[in-house]
Amino acid sequence: MDAPWAREQLRRRYLFPSEVELDCEDEAKPETPTAVEKKERPLPRLNIHSGFWILASIVVTYYVDFFKTFKENFHTNSWFLFGGALLFVSLSIAFYCIVYLEWYRGIEEYDVKYPTLVPITTATFIAAGICFNLALWNVWSFFTPLLLFTQFMGVVMFISLLG
């Protein structure tokens, strides 16, 4: 690679494509790919990664009696109520963004128009996760974050299969 060519490429790296075309009219343009080459095959929804998390979530639910434990400890700890309220707020904002703003109003980039919605949703969801960890800590001890994260990933991967 010769030095003048490298300097010229370095100089052109921040130019807009139209400026680059004007700058190098004498150079030959590479062929543009056809529509068939541009069209990429969509990724399959069910892959090894999502299958693993869904299966792991099912195994965790079965072996730790997740729903039975949740039902027995629901009324004994106030962290469940606080975590549930935060989770409700987080999911409400998410549904507001997806259903109302994107589907009904047609705002595709709602995160640009309303930049505080995504951080608020994320913060409330993380706070809800911390509350659920505190509520179930006396049951599973240091396994609680691992079990809840596995459940979370299983739900996320299952939802990704649906849509």
Curated annotation (Swiss-Prot):
It comes from the Eukaryota. It is a multi-pass membrane protein. It is found in: Membrane. Keywords: Membrane, Transmembrane, Transmembrane helix. GO terms for cellular component: membrane. The chain crosses the membrane at residues 47-67, 79-99, 117-137, 142-162. The keyword Transmembrane applies. Disulfide bonds: none annotated. InterPro entries: TMEM128. The keyword Zinc does not apply. This is Transmembrane protein 128. It comes from Mus musculus (Mouse). The lineage of its organism: Eukaryota, Metazoa, Chordata, Craniata, Vertebrata. The gene is Tmem128.
